[in-house]
């Protein structure tokens, strides 16, 4: 396994290089990864790829407090020295109306994540595994003729955050992913498709059989399709589709979007009802199901579980250091690192409010009523949504999207 960086040694080097440049205040965020991936087409290798990536961001504050930023992929002394000098020079053009600072939680304890590191497999063994998965999926139904989109990948990644006030964060992670998307065709009918994804900490731990089963069942279930009449229907979203929709409107919870005036929410929205009174929504980047969980964000703030909605009432926004300072609260661990620090969610948890009785009635009332689609009271199950980038108007609260179901 490839040797990792030594964050303490790197911070010591940066301190020395910054001092030689006359720089007192700086920070660095680094993300490095080694990736291997394969794709197949009817049993033949379609693509076999390996890549090493490094993205290092350096910020420098000058004597007037303005910030300059630069990017590099060179962690040698010469590369870091050039990055520091470049960021220092750029700070002369920093925006005096938007000056980020160090997160006050950049040195606070972080959660200990149980993320076992796995050895990488050879690219040929990945190819054999994906070929077998494709073969099994094609054999599930005569109508399944191709698996046009597929991939098996593994990654070893490393994240670092350092600053001149002593912050020293480092995280190592290995992950693997499998993606299968089948296409079925029958004479005289439109092609139907469905897919499935599986994630794990290593390629040997992937639930390959489960991925094949889900992709096959979804594709086969879509074969017997029929049009529905125009009308009003009760729609039931699959968990994945509902999370996609929540994510498309996540600007409602984003403090950066609120400050920029591109959110449905306002500063005064905290405490207002946004949803039905039995809905709870949390952002929990530390959820055990989050294979790619990060213990800290781009500013070094620890990741934590944050309540967004309680009983349908807005309780919190997602914050970076700058937005938290503007709102007079603590950073929440949702910042990226860049010329303008971004804010984004990690892992949504959706559930009924405890004690509300929400979700207990279920959908059995529709089965008992004997209602049929087209009568204006039918039930439509939505498995997946498409074209969210084009069909969602997040700042207006509207959407029009194609779906499978």
Regions found by a protein language model. Give the residues of each.
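N-terminal small-residue-enriched
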Residues: 1-405
